[in-house]
From Swiss-Prot:
One of its GO terms (biological process) is tRNA wobble guanine modification. Residues 488-502 have a biased composition (Low complexity). Zn(2+) binds at residues 279, 281, 284. The gene is tgtA. Its cofactor is Zn(2+). HAMAP family: TgtA_arch. It is an enzyme of class 2 (transferase). Substrate binds at residues 128, 196. GO terms for cellular component: cytoplasm. The lineage of its organism: Archaea, Methanobacteriati, Methanobacteriota, Stenosarchaea group, Halobacteria. This is tRNA-guanine(15) transglycosylase. Pathway: tRNA modification; archaeosine-tRNA biosynthesis. Disruption phenotype: Mutants lack the archaeosine modification, but do not show any growth defects.
Length: 516
């Protein structure tokens, strides 16, 4: 186990952790945002990032510092912390971003790691190759080999107390991402950035981003702190945390502000289009859109950048509380409704339900069924997987609430879509206490039918009758042929007809009583 990263709480694959950074003498609570600081541009000073926004860690570019005579001399003379006036942890990039943008840089892993150590970096980065999406597999494999060599060079370097990143690349090839994650995890390096996802996010390919991160996570150990390089828009943070990412960096707060763009948890707005500011941060409570538009360009940029940071840090606090409360999935689902591409990302997340289920706590807060995607949550998959723990004997009635006929049954179990069947003794256990709407969708019934099928498969000697409340044909088609089907509404109509014919003479056909 890595002794510098401690997991304190979790929900889905998301976690609250403590990252110890020995060279800085600080411990950073994760999930954490690393504001990007350009040493040439002072949009918001690092001292203010720390004192006003609560930043515990930031990231800057050691290659920019190294290639600027003035910055290099100052950093070597007084150290990075004094130069930036920041007491928290400082991560530095190696120039890999410049390599991706311009095709080459004038440094090596050995040189840049030594320079990062000399200027007082707390978490350093080797020179990896950020392979963009959709390249030929041969290029992705060749780039990955160069990155592997960079990790080997980083392992061999004398880094002292400085933590070192082990980037995970692999383009849009899940098997290469997983392989890269496994290789990085086997090194003695410390933090694991998933790289080259910015082009996916810029193109709103959140589903591809999810697949890349999920593949990398399969290769990495649970105790590996994961950094999603270049991610920092508040709209996608809950999704990324649910995947198991712990650290985020982005210059978006400043770059977007420079273009008059205003970040929200639902997307990006242009200041020129706003009549109201839908936020309660200090900037939005003091200024109106007209006030901001009347400011000079530099002042407007600074105020927008401050808002953008406030909303991003607030979202991380909201995510942490959701993890603590056990309702991170509800927050992810809410954010998924902000943009069709985010919904694609959410559905991609649910496609990795078996992977999520392995890390998701077995018991937590209330389960709210909010959409057809809720039918595919880890809790449903876990209930189906655990059908092998349930023993059914004799003739078992599986019912949504009523007794279908006068038949005698050896046992009566409840059926609740999307989970399916379970003994009534489990009715008050999580997640079977789920809040489910009266009008369910097809996915919920089809998942319940899968649960019935699993129970029948695990108990071949038992006989089953399913009393359903008008399930759709697509769901009933998934129920094994050996299960007798009865519609509760049809039985209710039949009993009503019999009661009408019999008048006051009584009803010998039974009644639809509660299964609870």
């Amino acid at each position: 186990m890595r002794d510098h990263f401690e997991l304190r709480d979790g929900d889905l694959a998301g976690r609250i952790g403590r990252l110890s950074v020995p060279r800085a003498g600080v411990t950073v609570e994760t999930p954490a945002l690393l504001p990007v600081v350009n040493p040439n541009i002072d949009t918001i000073s690092p001292a203010r990032l720390e004192s006003e926004f609560g930043a515990e860690i930031l990231i800057t570019n050691s290659y920019i510092i190294k290639t600027n005579d003035h910055l290099r001399e100052e950093a070597l003379d007084v150290g990075l912390h004094e130069m930036l006036d920041f007491d928290g942890a400082i991560m530095t990039d190696s120039g890999s971003f410049q390599l991706a943008e311009y095709g080459e840089i004038d440094t090596t892993t050995e040189e840049i790691l030594q320079f990062q150590r000399d200027i007082g970096t707390d978490i350093a980065t080797p020179v990896d190759i950020p392979t963009p999406p959709d390249v030929a597999r041969e290029q992705a494999e060749a780039d990955l080999e160069i990155t592997r060599q960079a990790l080997a060079d980083a392992e061999a370097a004398d880094t002292g107390e400085m933590l070192v990143n082990a980037p995970v690349q692999g383009s849009t090839y899940p098997d290469l991402r997983e392989e890269a994650g496994r290789h990085a995890d086997a090194t003695d390096l410390d933090v694991f950035p998933v790289g080259a996802v910015v082009p996916m996010m810029n193109a709103y390919r959140y589903d591809d981003m999810v697949d890349a991160v999920a593949a990398a996570k399969r290769g990495l150990g649970v105790d590996a702190p994961v950094h999603l390089f270049g991610a920092g828009h508040p709209m996608m943070l809950a999704l990324a945390v649910a995947l198991g990412c712990d650290l985020f960096d982005s210059a978006a707060y400043a770059l977007y502000a420079r273009d008059g763009r205003y970040l929200t948890v639902r997307g990006t707005e242009h200041l020129e289009d706003l009549d109201y500011l839908p936020c309660t941060c200090p900037i939005c409570t003091e200024y109106s859109p007209d006030d901001l538009r009347e400011k000079g360009s530099k002042r407007q940029e600074q105020l927008l950048a401050e808002h953008n940071l406030h909303v991003t840090f607030a979202e991380l606090r909201r995510i942490k509380q959701a993890i603590r409360d056990g309702d991170l999935m509800e927050l992810v689902e809410e954010r998924a409704r902000s943009h069709p591409a985010m919904l694609d990302g959410y559905r991609a997340l649910l496609a990795h339900v078996d992977q999520l289920e392995r890390e998701d706590p077995a018991s937590k807060g209330a389960f709210f069924y909010a959409s057809n995607e809720s039918a595919h949550r880890p809790e449903v998959a876990r209930h189906h997987a655990r059908m092998d723990r349930l023993t059914a004997e004799g003739h078992v009635l599986l019912t949504e609430g009523g007794v279908p006929s006068g038949d005698d049954f050896d046992a009566t179990w409840r059926v609740v879509p999307p989970f399916g069947p379970f003994p009534r003794s489990l009715s008050e256990t999580y997640p079977l206490t789920a809040e489910v709407p009266e009008r369910l969708d097809r996915d919920a019934y089809e998942q319940a039918a899968r649960g019935v099928s699993r129970l029948v498969e695990e108990n071949p000697d038992a006989a089953f009758t399913l009393a359903h409340d008008d399930w759709p044909e697509s769901a009933l088609a998934r129920v094994p042929e050996s299960v007798e089907l009865e519609s509760l509404s049809a039985v209710s109509e039949r009993l009503g007809d019999e009661a009408s014919v019999g008048g006051d003479d009584g009803d010998d056909g039974g009644s639809a009583s509660s299964a609870e």
